[in-house]
Amino acid sequence: MAPLESPATASSSEVESSSEEIFKSSSEESKPKDPVTVPSSKTLKSPSAAVNSKTDSSDDSEKQSFVLTRRKKKEGAAESPAVKSGKKRAGEGSTSRDMHVKRVKKEDDNKKANPQRVWSEEDEISLLQAVIDFKAETGTSPWDHKNAFFDIAKKSISFDVSHVQFFDKIRRLKNKYFVNRKNKSGESNHDKKCLGLAVLIWGSDGMNVESPVKKDESILVKGKANSKEKKVEKPLVIEDEQVILGADSEWFEESFLVPVIANLGLDEYSVKKKWSKVSLETKKKIQEKMKVVDAKKCELLLAEMDVLKDVTSVLAQTN
């Protein structure tokens, strides 16, 4: 039998290394291990940990508010068309109400700026025509019998006119269509009618209305050269204007023509009214003819007187 081999003996270096390993392992085992700490909610937090928790909570609240805002925006964007149309309609309604209020205010301002006209165009024509008709009917001036003229003429006015309004309107119509009249190419038919009636009433060849003195009025005019103020007297007007009849109207109404023509079937009022509408040029021509007739009448009367003298002389000499 082979002799048993003795186990290999370790070298000194190997023995030293193994001994060091054993020593390290034993020392590591002898050290107490750190206990595993389990976090507890009851443990007190340090100040730094509290600050960190606050910042974390604020971040969480910001995130929550951001999420809520996003949700609201989405909900607003997801609103139904009916809700949107309702809101739009409500906005349009408020806008239309505002526009209506502005329009009403504008109309009120226009009404204040432009007051409603009291005298119509027909009233103005009727008023001027009433002056002519009263003279033709009565043979006297309307201003000599103002109350009677007012009682008759106010019936042709479309509204309940007062005594002051009545005669003030006549004065203003005279100033507009006679005193301050101007030839305008754009005059309306109404203006032309009023102008014709005004000339017939206040013209020198018509009824010839004169304007007596009302009160002493004057105006100051600055001279161009020396810039001195000069006092210029204005023509004065009396409120109660008097109508002075033209000679052409007097001779016609006092002549034999009116009763003779009236005997033919027309009444004197119609004759005088129609005569007042005859043109002034025609009136003058007829008046000249009447002067010739009156002269021949004088000659005829003298001839008749001469014949009468001869007859009376002969009769006186006869036994």
UniProtKB/Swiss-Prot annotation:
Please name the InterPro entries in this protein's record: GEBP (IPR007592), GeBP-like_C (IPR053933), GeBP-like_DBD (IPR053932)
**For this chain's UniProt record, which GO biological process terms are given?**
cellular response to glucose stimulus; negative regulation of gene expression; regulation of DNA-templated transcription
> Could you say which tissues express the protein in this record?
Expressed strongly in leaves and flowers, weakly in roots, and very weakly in stems.
Key word Signal present: no
What causes induction of this gene?
Answer: Up-regulated upon glucose treatment.
Ranges annotated as biased composition (Basic and acidic residues):
21-34, 89-112
**GO molecular-function annotation terms?**
transcription cis-regulatory region binding
Q: What is its main location?
A: nucleus
Which keywords are on file for this protein? DNA-binding, Nucleus, Repressor, Transcription, Transcription regulation
Localization per Swiss-Prot or TrEMBL: Nucleus
* Cellular component, GO annotation: nucleus
Q: Where is this region: Disordered?
A: 1-119
Q: Tell me its family.
A: Belongs to the GeBP family.
Protein's job: Transcription repressor that binds DNA in a sequence-specific manner, 5'-GCCT-3', to regulate the expression of PGR. Acts as a modulatory component for the glucose-triggered developmental leaf growth process.
What is the name attached to this protein's record? Transcription factor STKL2
